A protein has these predicted regions:
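Bacterial N-terminal signal peptides that target proteins for export
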Residues: 1-8
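Bacterial N-terminal signal peptides
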Residues: 9-17
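Electrostatic cytochrome c docking/interface patches
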Residues: 22-47, 123-125
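Gly/Gly-Pro-rich "capping" loops immediately C-terminal to redox-active cysteine motifs
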Residues: 32-43, 56-87, 93, 100
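The canonical Cys-X-X-Cys-His
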Residues: 42, 49-57, 94, 109-113
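A general structural signal for well-ordered secondary-structure junctions
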Residues: 51-52, 73, 91, 119
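Axial heme c-ligation environment in periplasmic c-type cytochrome domains
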Residues: 62-66, 87-125
Length: 125
């Protein structure tokens, strides 16, 4: 009985640790969230990194999805968008940009994409 209790305790402790890691991951904050200049830098990166080849001008979609569509973006946190740019998406044409772009540059791209989506939403598009 003591052995079973020890195993149960160790399992619960491990699960609690995993939850803490997941929470920390979910809590990443875009350091450029309130910096309007970062969106302009993000737009330049969008062009220079070749994002337009798949996502079209102004990120409105081509081969890849429309990254300004609020309905499409709704389920994604900024952290998820950041990680998708950083690590790519397996089974898709989305390549990882880790090693090509710095974390700072990826956050600037995230800022640009979210701002474009907000502008589009405000315009009723």
């Amino acid at each position: 009985m003591v052995k079973n209790t020890t195993i149960l305790f160790a399992t619960l402790l491990g699960l609690t640790s995993l939850r803490s890691i997941a929470t920390a991951e979910d809590d990443l904050v875009n350091p450029f969230d309130h910096d309007p200049a970062a969106a302009a830098t993000g737009k330049k990166l969008f062009i220079s990194a070749g994002c337009m080849a798949c996502h079209g001008g102004n990120a409105r979609g081509a081969v890849g999805p429309d990254l300004t569509d609020q309905e499409w973006l709704r389920p994604f946190s900024q952290t998820m968008v950041f990680r998708t740019i950083q690590n790519g998406r397996s089974g898709t044409l989305m390549s990882p940009f880790k090693g090509t772009l710095t974390d700072e540059q990826i956050w600037q791209l995230v800022k640009y994409l979210l701002d474009e989506g907000r502008k589009r939403n405000a315009a009723g598009e």
